[in-house]
A protein has these predicted regions:
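Bacterial N-terminal signal peptides that target proteins for export
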Residues: 1-13
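Bacterial N-terminal signal peptides
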Residues: 10-22
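Scaffold/interface architecture of coatomer-like assemblies
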Residues: 26-308
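Residue-level recognition of conserved structural "scaffold" positions that shape functional pockets
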Residues: 2, 15-18, 200
Length: 308
């Protein structure tokens, strides 16, 4: 998360979370189009790190990195802690615009088991979304595994209606008001990236996720990832919100394992706002000693030019 904090109160923030694989130091998503209220004096940033072998670094120290905030190098941190990944709120979005195959149905059952049993994420922190005709729908929340929810996914196509972006907005709004306010929140999207009927645009879906502090991880259900507009949309959704894009072919459980591994080595750092200059503050995290360390986060935060 990158968020200016007022001295006496913490305002809503948006997350900057890191994921593994093929990244360079400080890679981030698109510029958020939001402002904060005035009198903010502190920035909080959530991130993760990997080593040269693409493994999460669980022993990171505050001296191992520096933050570059709008060209100001920050090494004097107010706080530095490991994130509590057991509070993770996970939502899964299933693109049901086409028939959900028996294989995918089985994979969803495995995913629910992985999240609840193997990863130790409480059942109440898990929800499942899908399309119901042209409308977003919540299949379950808090009892997905007990209700065998994966078996109740629609077995027939939604007649070409694909409200993907609307469903992302719907799920992000749900997560924003659900669970621990300080919990990291992630929406895992299983889709081909196509949208045929949403009122919301791709940009509005990204904005909704950022405003709700939800990051998107997208598992591409296309047969081939390259040259597809849907794949490009999924890459945009993931990249702009600090998540990760998983190209085909790939297994659902395998992708979730990678996502969960990332949260086990995530951190939160806070520092005094280095500049009250209005506008976009680009943020990067760079290694100070081990140049093989790599960090990934969103691009920064937007500071207001007037009192809101």
């Amino acid at each position: 998360m990158a968020r200016p904090l007022p001295c006496w109160h913490t305002w809503p923030l948006f997350s900057l979370l890191a994921f593994w694989g093929g990244i360079s130091p400080g890679i981030a998503g698109d510029r958020p189009d939001f402002t904060y209220r005035a009198n903010a004096t502190e920035v909080r940033l959530s991130f993760s790190a990997i080593d040269q072998n693409n493994h999460g670094v669980a022993t990171l120290q505050a001296s191992d990195f520096a933050v570059v905030d709008k060209d100001v190098i920050v090494r004097d941190f107010q706080s530095f802690t490991r994130s509590d990944w057991t509070k993770l709120e996970i939502a899964i979005l299933i693109d049901s615009s086409e028939s959900v195959t028996p294989r995918l149905r089985r994979e969803m059952t495995d995913v629910l088991e992985l999240v609840s049993q193997t990863a130790g994420v409480p059942d109440e922190n898990l929800s499942l979304f899908y399309f119901e005709g042209s409308q977003p729908a919540l299949l379950c929340a808090g009892d997905c595994r007990a209700r065998h929810s994966a078996e109740r996914l629609p077995a027939v196509p939604a007649r070409g209606l694909t409200p993907l972006f609307d469903t992302i907005v719907f799920a992000a709004d749900f997560l924003a008001g659900h669970g621990d306010a300080q919990a990291e929140k992630v929406l895992v999207v299983f889709s081909d990236g196509a949208d045929t009927v949403s009122r919301s645009s791709l940009g509005e879906a990204v904005d909704a996720a950022l405003k709700s502090e939800v990051e998107l991880n997208c598992i591409d259900l296309n047969k081939a990832a390259y040259g597809s507009q849907g794949a490009a949309a999924l890459r945009t959704l993931a990249g702009a919100t600090g998540g990760r894009y998983f190209p085909p072919p790939g297994g659902a459980a395998q992708a979730l394992n990678v996502i969960l591994e990332g949260f086990r080595a995530s951190y939160a750092v806070s520092y005094r706002l280095p500049s009250h200059t209005a506008g976009f503050h680009a943020v990067r995290i760079l290694p100070t000693h081990n140049l093989n360390l790599q960090f990934r986060s969103r691009r920064g935060y937007y500071y207001p030019n007037r009192v809101q």
